């Protein structure tokens, strides 16, 4: 199983859940996105496209095989390309004696002096520990992958919020993001799924809601009691 910023996102969204990454890693069937999720996806693509349109000439790396995109990313960074769209990074980390591949595809790399700014578009209006810690971890992981690829840290990690405000995320060398990946990897490596209580608000928008609620009802889970969430 590859790890990526999306792995961290799955742990936090649509709500924090220890079970969701395990289900994804083990190929559990997931419901198709509902109308609301589809609208969010369209808005996200439009937000990204609008920012892309305002950047001027950009090397578009969104096409090609995964291996080709990785190689092209390295090549263009070495050449000092002014801006890259959908670059691909890959590295490995060691978790419990095993090498695990880590991949990441930030939206943009923007040339800044001798290095680059890593920039990603989000619909969220905030990016902080209290409201969207997963955004911080994702950007930190992109920064770590960039440093492993380019041999130097990014000059900045930036989020383009849903209102087009650009917010900078402090770079800690990737420590917190890697710690999050270690935790998730150890959970997904379990033979049996971890327990995570269902909740009306917690499970809204999750593709595994039907599965988890059916199992909770089957075992008479206390989390089904009214007022327990």
Task: Put a short name on every predicted segment.
Residues 10-23, 192-221:
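Cysteine-cluster motifs in flexible loop/terminal segments that predominantly coordinate metals
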Residues 1-115:
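Metal-dependent nuclease catalytic cores that hydrolyze phosphodiester bonds in DNA/RNA
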Residues 1-5, 186-197:
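Short, intrinsically disordered, charge-biased short linear motifs at domain edges
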Residues 222-229:
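Helix-hairpin-helix
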Residues 17, 108, 142, 206, ...:
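A residue-level signal for conserved active-site and pocket-lining positions in enzyme catalytic cores
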Residues 79-182:
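Mg2+/Mn2+-dependent nuclease catalytic core
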């Amino acid at each position: 199983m590859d790890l990526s910023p999306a792995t961290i996102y799955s742990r936090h969204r649509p709500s924090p859940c220890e079970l969701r990454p395990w289900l994804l890693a083990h190929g559990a069937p997931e419901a198709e996105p509902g109308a609301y999720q589809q609208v969010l996806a369209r808005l996200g693509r439009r937000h990204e496209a609008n920012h892309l349109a305002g950047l001027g000439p950009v090397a578009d790396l969104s096409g090609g095989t995964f291996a080709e995109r990785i190689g092209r990313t390295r090549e263009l960074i070495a050449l000092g390309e002014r801006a890259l769209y959908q670059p691909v990074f890959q590295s490995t980390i060691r978790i419990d004696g095993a090498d695990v591949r880590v991949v990441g595809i930030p939206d943009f790399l923007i040339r800044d002096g001798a290095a680059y700014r890593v920039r990603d578009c989000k619909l969220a209006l905030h990016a902080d520990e209290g409201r969207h810690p997963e955004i911080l971890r994702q950007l930190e992981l992109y920064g770590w992958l960039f440093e492993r690829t380019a041999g130097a840290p990014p000059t900045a990690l930036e989020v383009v919020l849903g209102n087009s405000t650009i917010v900078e995320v402090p770079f800690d060398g990737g420590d917190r993001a890697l710690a999050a990946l270690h935790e998730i990897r150890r959970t997904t490596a379990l033979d049996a799924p971890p327990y995570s209580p269902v909740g009306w608000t917690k499970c809204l928008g999750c593709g595994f809601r039907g599965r988890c609620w059916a199992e909770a009802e089957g075992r008479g889970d206390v989390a089904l009691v009214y007022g327990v969430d």
